[in-house]
Amino acid sequence: MHSFKILALACAITAGTAATAQAQEVVNLYSARHYATDEALYNNFTKATGIKINRVDSDDAGIVARLKAEGAASPADVVLMVDAARLYRGEKDNLFLPIRSAKLEEVIPANLRAQPEADGGITWFGLSTRARVIAYNKAKVNAEDVDSYEKLADPKNKGKICIRSASHPYNLSLFGAVTEHIGEAKAQQWLQGVKDNLARPPKGGDTDQIKAVAAGECDIAVTNSYYFARLMRSSNPDDVAVANKVSVVFPNQSSWGTHLNIAGGAVAKYSKNKDNAVKFLEYLASPEAQTYFANGNNEWPAAKNVQTDNPALKAMTQDKPFKSETIPISAVGSNMAKVQQMLDRAGFQ
């Protein structure tokens, strides 16, 4: 059973005109985003619109479980998740309400949102992006030996790689993207090669992998970009020292581009405040909110033509654009079942 931290949620909506009127001035949010800067976003939205945000925090899996358990009685209006595959699963489990929003459809690229329904409705939209990058010990590894995901399986990297659990959503999404690019047969061989190159059994989170590289426990790690940026911007000198010992590469610049995952949002299927929910998602795609995502949590905007000024992200990319993959992010979710089967066959935990 997943535990929830309830911050200000009305657990039941009573019948009656007064209650209905009051409900129209709130958005009940189920969020897997646990970032301090997001609180400022919610406050700004309330100041601008008068619509109060009542938030429940959990992880993606906990939100899905709660929505399923609550069914039509759910008070949720908006769902925020931090993984494309989980958003795809929520869509297929019929937990979200397809919507039409000219604002969202204009600014969020088609490959960073759900495929449209027959009537044009879209069930979820990416709101920020994060790259799955390769970190490496610059004193021991040449950048050209880790400049693609495929090279993680190269025998020359045997015994060098640290990675969190293969079944973690961030890795599942990467593996789903690689499968989409190279096909299931080659992806199976690749996964086996990556497993064979591990320096230790998978453990810990992404930051732990970066620190393991800095400590010499391994030479190569796979991580989301914002974890490295956090170390670079940390007020803790030890964190900065870790970042200074490690370099990152944005893989596959000469082929399909670096894999991007998303944090995204959807209107809950049984939303009692649909109009407010859509307004909130539109606000999260606005330049103001997109800049918060980039500068506050070291993510890249999902919306088009938003300028940001994050020194860590600039340093990571050498202040140049990087090539990212352009496959529909929904394709990553559709590959999850076969990816799990491939991991089982490889014994990659």
Set out the residue ranges of the language-model regions.
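Sec/Tat signal peptide C-region and signal peptidase I cleavage site
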Residues: 17-23
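Early extracytoplasmic/lumenal segment of secretory-pathway proteins
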Residues: 23-89, 349
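Short beta-strand->loop
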Residues: 30-33, 120-124, 136-138, 144, ...
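A structural signal for short loop-to-beta-strand junctions that line the ligand-binding cleft
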Residues: 74-79, 97-134, 150, 161
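Periplasmic solute-binding protein
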Residues: 87-95, 117-147, 175-176, 260-266
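Ligand-binding pocket segment of bilobal, Venus flytrap-like solute-binding proteins
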Residues: 166, 170-173, 177-251
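Mature extracytoplasmic/periplasmic domains
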Residues: 263-326
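Extracellular/periplasmic bilobal clamshell ligand-binding domains
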Residues: 309-349
